[in-house]
UniProtKB/Swiss-Prot annotation:
Membrane topology: Multi-pass membrane protein
Membrane-traversing stretches: 26-46, 67-87, 96-116, 126-146, 168-188, 213-233, 235-255, 289-309, 312-332, 338-358, 360-380, 381-401
Protein name: Uncharacterized transporter MJ0718
Family to which this protein belongs: Belongs to the chromate ion transporter (CHR) (TC 2.A.51) family.
GO CC annotations on file: plasma membrane
Length: 402
């Protein structure tokens, strides 16, 4: 039985309509996903399920390219994947819609939790709960360190660089210095591989237009910070601080923790380390990446406006970097020099996370009960149990036995 040509056309039109959603459709879909996608990096699986299996907006290969790109640039991986999907579907508007929609639920929930925190943190009944939260943060940092180690530590040289990075951070050297030292070591180790060919980056002509939008965004960032500088020095500090953190947050959201700790606690004394740990812990009760801690920091330092400024600032640089990287991704993923330097950076991140874990552990009042909560939460995280479940179970244990 032959199908009428008109029927074929209608069927094709329906497929194109289904596979090319509007920016509003993208926004609403990622908004819904952002409400339930707990688990940090594991949330990428939820994004894949929605866009590849359920809605069939992308094929597997295209989605995997987005995941691969998110792994080699700074920023929270799941946020970068969301933006990549949006860009694939609707260009710059789609990228912005997916990126903003995915972050919005986490921001609102974190803001709500922070307001509650400010009202109850001094109550006697909440002391044990926040002590349990800090133990969870130690478990989280230890688990993140273990995962980073398994992925990136390959040689004795890697272990040596890890130890140097950890020692420098423990000695209160800036993590930015640690990263630059790692890049320098990487250049020294792989300088023989540097050739004209290895430094060549090909940009397809049809993809050059994206840099026009990147230029607009960079100009917008400049104006944004200029206005903040003129009206409120504290808000300007929050903005530049969070942007700096985001630029160096390789390896996903966990990579931001040492930098944010250094900037917020050590360098500018905006809060003490225990309060910062509380912010990280509250972030685990929300969907979205660990960098949503920026909302907590922003609210404590600058109120509601501060929370908005911090949240926008901690996501903006990585969004711009993603857009800038899409045209050159094919060159980057096969570039030996880039891959080796990135490896050095990620190895140094393991060292930074080791130092952060030690520092956080020293802030906990350890007891047999605290050790039980740590072991239980660490094992559950190691076994990839849902983050929200782990946090809630640990809070119940803390309330009962601490």
């Amino acid at each position: 039985m032959m199908m009428h040509p008109m029927n074929k056309t209608n069927k094709r039109d329906k497929m194109e309509k289904r596979n090319n959603p509007s920016a509003l459709n993208i926004f609403m879909s990622f908004l819904k996903l952002g409400m339930v996608a707990f688990g940090g990096p594991t949330a990428i699986a939820y994004v894949r399920e929605m866009v590849v299996d359920e809605k069939k907006w992308m094929d597997e290969k295209s989605f995997n390219n987005g995941v691969a790109l998110a792994q080699i640039i700074p920023g929270a991986s799941v946020m970068q994947v969301a933006a990549y999907v949006g860009f694939y579907l609707r260009g710059i508007v789609g990228a912005f819609a997916a990126f903003m929609a995915y972050a919005l639920p986490a921001f609102l929930i974190m803001l709500f939790l922070t307001i509650i925190y400010m009202h109850v943190k001094s109550l006697p009944k909440t002391v044990s709960i926040f002590e349990a939260l800090r133990i969870i943060v130690v478990s989280l940092a230890a688990n993140g360190t273990l995962n980073f180690s398994k992925k990136n530590i390959r040689t004795i040289g890697d272990v040596f660089l890890l130890l140097i990075s950890a020692l420098l951070f423990i000695l209160k050297f800036s993590p930015f210095i640690v990263i630059f030292v790692s890049i320098f070591i990487g250049f020294l180790m792989y300088r023989r591989d540097i050739t004209k060919l290895s430094l060549k980056i090909d940009i397809p002509r049809e993809k050059l237009r994206i840099y026009k939008y990147v230029a607009y965004l960079l100009f917008g960032v400049f104006l944004f910070n200029l206005i903040l500088y003129m009206i409120d020095s504290k808000l300007f500090l929050l903005s530049t601080l969070m942007m700096k953190v985001d630029v160096f947050a390789f390896g996903g959201g966990y990579g931001s923790v040492p930098f944010m700790l250094h900037e917020v606690v050590d360098k500018y004394n905006l809060m003490d380390a225990k309060t910062f740990m509380d912010g990280i812990a509250l972030g685990q009760i929300t969907p979205g990446p660990i960098v949503i801690t920026a909302t907590f920091v922003g609210y404590i330092v600058g109120g509601f406006i501060g929370s908005i400024i911090s949240t926008i600032s901690v996501f903006t640089p990585s969004f711009i970097i993603l857009l800038s990287s899409i045209p050159i991704f094919d060159s980057l993923k096969h570039n030996t020099i880039f891959k080796n330097i990135l490896h050095m950076i990620l190895v140094s991140f393991v060292g930074l996370l080791v130092a952060v874990t030690i520092r956080f552990a020293l802030l906990v009042d350890w007891s047999i009960q605290a050790l039980i909560i740590f072991i239980v939460s660490f094992l559950l995280l190691y076994k990839k149990y849902n983050m929200l479940l782990v946090v809630l179970l640990s809070l119940v244990l803390g309330y009962l036995i601490l």
